[in-house]
Regions:
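Carboxylate-rich, polar loop motifs that coordinate divalent cations or form catalytic acidic clusters
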Residues: 1-154
Length: 154
């Protein structure tokens, strides 16, 4: 009986070593991006990868773009706490900020505030082409073809 238990323990040890080898053979690669690498703040509220492969980062003090090598900060938004990012089209991002909802043109680096009551925009979700749900502290909004409409939930 002791011999069988010893054999089972040896087999179990070999199985566990084999499983550990499988997991250790594919290490996870990651980057740690901080103010040292160019972020204006280490407080990151939103991350979005666009269709071009850029990673957009919404921080406590503005918007940044990471291309895999370097961080670019957009100073036009340096005073805005960005909570949410969605891609509207190949040129435009939709940004949820503490001062409302804004369009950001990637070609011109210009922001335009969308006409909704001033409220902190906490989340934006794309539900179809040119259709978004926007969660604010003042309620929920539905945007269709750039036209916002408040949704009242009962």
């Amino acid at each position: 009986m002791k011999k069988i238990i010893l054999q089972l323990i040896i087999v179990l040890v070999f199985i566990l070593l084999k499983v550990e080898g499988v997991y250790s053979s594919s290490p996870m690669n990651y980057y740690n991006i901080t103010t040292f690498e160019g972020l204006p703040s280490n407080t990151v509220n939103a991350i979005k990868k666009d269709a071009s492969g850029f990673i957009w980062i919404g921080t406590k003090v503005g918007l940044c773009r990471f291309d895999g090598c370097e961080v670019k900060t957009y100073p036009l938004l340096s005073e805005d706490d960005i909570w949410s990012i969605e891609e509207l089209d190949s040129d435009t991002l939709l940004l949820g900020t503490v001062s409302g909802l804004k369009y950001f043109s990637r070609k011109t680096n210009v922001t335009v505030k969308l006409d909704i009551p001033s409220a902190i925009v906490k989340s934006i979700r794309k539900i179809a082409d040119s259709q978004f749900l926007v969660g604010t502290e003042a309620g929920l909004y539905f945007i269709n073809n750039h036209t916002p409409r408040q949704i009242f939930l009962e």
